[in-house]
Amino acid sequence: MSETYVLKADLRTRVGKGSSRELRRNGQIPAVIYGDKQEPLAIAVSYKEIFYKIHGGGFKTTVATIEVDGKKIQVLPKDYQLDPVRDFPQHVDFLRVSAKSVVHVNVPVHFKNEEAAPGIKRGGVLNVVRHDVELIVPANAIPEALEIDLSGLEIGDSVHISAVKLPKGATPAIQDRDFTIATIAAPAGLKSEENAEGAAEEAKDGE
């Protein structure tokens, strides 16, 4: 699980475009905390802190503690809006979580030991089908990433979700099939040779 962090926030007494613009001029951005059968809470958080958290990676898979109005609220970032031109954060949605919370979260996939995959050594290409996997997981057990070991994989081999070790209590959101995460594809040269051989065999058969 990623290391948690603390965000200090202020309550927002006014909402709307005008107040949001004023917040941004003062180095803050609007945000909301919702969920856990409680009323949404409008807050303002530091633009600088959110910018670095978003662009530093792992933002939506890390539980945070927001300190606001004398309270500490555990949250999971669920969504954010960026300026379409400059990629500056404009707004953040936080979901309230507790020790018993189970959440849906997209976890990035990381690959290791490419040098130990014979298929890649022979010129094969790692074809990533899914760069992240949606998990249903306890909020206190969200992994930073799913690590996939490519050791021993040959050209034509695939990695399916059933081969991935998940954290305790975690399950894939997709349950109806053993979906593919990555394959070792043949290099273009090898494909061309195979196609040429196949065409030659067909020509012989037609004689």
From Swiss-Prot:
Domain of life: Bacteria
Biological processes, Gene Ontology terms: translation
CDD domains: Ribosomal_L25_TL5_CTC (cd00495)
Keywords: Ribonucleoprotein, Ribosomal protein, RNA-binding, rRNA-binding
Keyword presence, tRNA-binding: no
GO CC terms in record: cytosolic large ribosomal subunit
InterPro entries, per database record: Rbsml_bL25/Gln-tRNA_synth_N, Ribosomal_bL25/Gln-tRNA_synth, Ribosomal_bL25_b-dom, Ribosomal_bL25_C, Ribosomal_bL25_long, Ribosomal_L25_dom, Ribosomal_uL5_bac-type
MF (Gene Ontology): 5S rRNA binding; structural constituent of ribosome
Disulfide bonds, paired cysteine numbers: none
Pfam families documented for this protein: Ribosomal_L25p, Ribosomal_TL5_C
HAMAP family to which the protein is assigned, alphabetical: Ribosomal_bL25_CTC
Quaternary structure (record): Part of the 50S ribosomal subunit; part of the 5S rRNA/L5/L18/L25 subcomplex. Contacts the 5S rRNA. Binds to the 5S rRNA independently of L5 and L18.
Function: This is one of the proteins that binds to the 5S RNA in the ribosome where it forms part of the central protuberance.
Family recorded in the similarity comment: Belongs to the bacterial ribosomal protein bL25 family. CTC subfamily.
Protein name: Large ribosomal subunit protein bL25
Organism of this sequence: Brucella abortus (strain 2308)
Organism placement in taxonomy: Bacteria, Pseudomonadati, Pseudomonadota, Alphaproteobacteria, Hyphomicrobiales
